[in-house]
């Protein structure tokens, strides 16, 4: 089971998770980020920095509730950083609240820390290793197992405080189930990988949600115990603070933050560090800076003070197991990634638009530190070419510039002060301007009537295909004005329709002349018809008179 999951619909392509992932164990495909399980060290930085909360820690609350339904006692191992997360709430108040949820008991993981630090002291006194690296932090263990396998011999083969404590609980309560509660994502993986010691892991956030749903309020009750020095464990240098540090052979040092730890491991790899006991913590500030703490409760100074005030001056009184009972074996975790050849990297860089060294900006906007690192990620299928912001910007600008340059329509871009910000060649031609410098930065009133622009700006209603005559340029244009509210810009598109208008006028003239000729022909024909009718009328009258006279003459005879 993966400890970190993803809300697919929430990813917004900001690449922040890649940028903050120290080992770049995130694959990006189809506008979606995916965590690569066999490369991830579970530091939780992607969970912390994701602005969309697209990364989720797998919630084991239901699993714990199932454990509570059994007849076996379920005992909590509570990480010592709880005092920083739950301000003013001591172990007794936490124990009472946890019992209300159904737990049999709750103990401090610091008990296990005392066991572990004592074993470290034995190692320092009896071990022949040049360097000893603490193995309390599971993320650091994974970092060494996956990325620095040559340094595995230096990793202390000792159980973590969580494991040592839960193992001690099961020694005292053979039928017990153990649940660790802390600020860490990696502990969920550690519990799963090393089966039979820790039965479930909850984060402080999961516990807080459970308290709220159950209606349990924590009593602000602090307590103190002189025998509780191991409560310092969740702070940077906390392990060393509990150790004797009396072996002159070793230099004792504490390193926190994955980047710093990686730098130290590289120095060890290169033979630059010797005779050291190194406390390593993946989180800045150690466990009080864990992902759940950093995400929801980031107050490093205040948290350290809370831990320091809660910790005692002496060790917990515990039964120290034999060393063999505390042994933990670490093996190399293979990642199986073959590096690309130089030719393959160059070919990918060319596809990214990086044809020469000066093109490699190494801006980091894609999440990778260098363009070459990004090219290698593309080769391994972890990244896409489209993730390069300068590449996309250049591509978009080239595309838009080609459109602006080559469109036959005039384009003018104005700000809200009606000042010309951009103008293309077609618009220059319409307005008889020689170059953009003749008008850029000046008011549009110099070349066009601003009335339509003001109307669009004031009403917010765009104007489309308004035909007008520009008398000063003796040209007809169809003008469209669009107001971009987001960028506060006015976009004017002018189509020169002078030729169309000339053709239209010519056609109108021809039509008018044709109508006039037709009217003249009709008039002439009507006159001819009228003349013919008049002549026919006179002839008919004369004929009638003649016939009448002929009729009368015949009748008289």
List the predicted regions and their residue ranges:
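PAS-family sensory/regulatory modules and their coupling/dimerization elements
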Residues: 449-499
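Iron-sulfur-associated redox domains of electron-transfer enzymes in respiratory
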Residues: 58-336, 340-349, 369-376
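Sensory modules in modular signal-transduction proteins
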Residues: 395-429
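Sensory coupling linkers of modular signal transduction proteins
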Residues: 483-528
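Signal-transducing coiled-coil/dimerization helices and immediately adjacent hinge/linker segments
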Residues: 509-557
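Short, charged amphipathic alpha-helical "coupling" segments at sensory-output junctions
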Residues: 385-406, 503-510, 521
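PAS/PAS-like sensory domain cap-loop motif
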Residues: 427-439
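Iron-sulfur cluster-binding cysteine motifs and their immediate structural context
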Residues: 3-8, 12-36, 41, 45-61, ...
